[in-house]
C-alpha cells in the first residue's frame, strides 16, 4: 500500500441527526445497512491477506456512540439506553470485528457519563471480553485527555491510567 500500512478508517458510527458534522462519513442511520457497509469497507482495506502489497490495516471508529451526540454537536455528551446501544450503535462495530478489523479507535464523547476512552464496559467488557477482540484500541487524537474535561481524571497521568485500565492500548 505504497508504504502506508494503517488507516484510521472506516468510520462505522450510526447517526440519526443530520446536524452532526461527521454524518457523511458513516454508514447511515440503519444498523443493518451500516453493518454491511462496515464489512465491505474492512474487507476492501484489508482483503484476505495483509501481507499483500495492496492491503492496509483498517480501524473501526469511533467506539462507541459518537454519532449519537446530543444536539448533533461534536464532542458532546451521549445519553442512550442499553436498547439503543446494543441494537443500533454496536452492530456495525461487531460486524467490523467479525470481518477481521485489526484495530478499533475509541471516541471523544462520553457515554452516559463515562468518557469512551476510559469506558471499561465498551472496551474491556464488550470489545475485548464478549467479542473476544484480539487487536488493539487506539485513542482518537487526544481523546484520553477528555477524561480530564469530563471530570473523571484530575490530570493526564490519571487519564492515561484510567484509559489503559479500561482497555485503551495506544494514545494517538
Give the residues covered by each predicted segment.
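Glycoside hydrolase catalytic-domain context in secreted enzymes
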Residues: 1-172
Amino acid at each position: 500500500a505504497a508504504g502506508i500500512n494503517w488507516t484510521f478508517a472506516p468510520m462505522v458510527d450510526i447517526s440519526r441527526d443530520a446536524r452532526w458534522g461527521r454524518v457523511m462519513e458513516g454508514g447511515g442511520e440503519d444498523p443493518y445497512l451500516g453493518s454491511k457497509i462496515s464489512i465491505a469497507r474492512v474487507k476492501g482495506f484489508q482483503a484476505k491477506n495483509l501481507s499483500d502489497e495492496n492491503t492496509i490495516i483498517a480501524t473501526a471508529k469511533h467506539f462507541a456512540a459518537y454519532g449519537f451526540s446530543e444536539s448533533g454537536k461534536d464532542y458532546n455528551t451521549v445519553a442512550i439506553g442499553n436498547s439503543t446501544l446494543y441494537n443500533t450503535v454496536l452492530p456495525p462495530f461487531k460486524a467490523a470485528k467479525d470481518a477481521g478489523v485489526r484495530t478499533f479507535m475509541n471516541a471523544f464523547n462520553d457515554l452516559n457519563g463515562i468518557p469512551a476512552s476510559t469506558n471499561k464496559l465498551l472496551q474491556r467488557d464488550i470489545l475485548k471480553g464478549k467479542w473476544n477482540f484480539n487487536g488493539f484500541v487506539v485513542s482518537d487524537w487526544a481523546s484520553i485527555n477528555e477524561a480530564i474535561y469530563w471530570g473523571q481524571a484530575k490530570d493526564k497521568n490519571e487519564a492515561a491510567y484510567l484509559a489503559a485500565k479500561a482497555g485503551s492500548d495506544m494514545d494517538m
